[in-house]
Amino acid sequence: MLKNVVNRVSGRKRLAKLLGLSLKQEGDRQFLLDMLPKGSVGAEIGVHLGDFSQEIIDIISPGELHLIDPWEHLTSSIYKTAWYGGGAKGGQVEMEERYASIRERFYQCLHANQVKVHRGYSTDILRQFPDQYFDWVYIDGNHLYEYVRKGLELSFQKMSNWMGT
């Protein structure tokens, strides 16, 4: 998870060096899937259409996977290129369709209680879980610094110690 966060930060090579991390090519998430334990309890913040969620299910076969996303169209100019802003030409209607597609795509996993879909902001949703509930949290939601920072702080509180947190 830390490598993924570092990959998204300006000056990531320097930050990775300070943290003692070696980075793979940007966009390569396979290394994350390889290091996450099978049967673990995890959360994905920022689900979009569920493509990475599907990879998590297929490769990790988590005991529980919590998919967290507000599926909300944001109209502020700072989101003009984001898939949840200007990139969603259909506005909130498109977001409702994306949410419905997630529920349909993971229908069997939902009914097997392997996947749980939470619609809302990650900070609000994560607060509903006890501390150290998750084995891992994958953060790929709102990419603005303040939101990433809040997500990281709360995620570390909600994760167990398997990754040394």
Where are these regions (language model features)?
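S-adenosylmethionine/decaboxylated-SAM
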Residues: 29-165
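Class I SAM-dependent methyltransferase Rossmann-like catalytic core
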Residues: 1-39
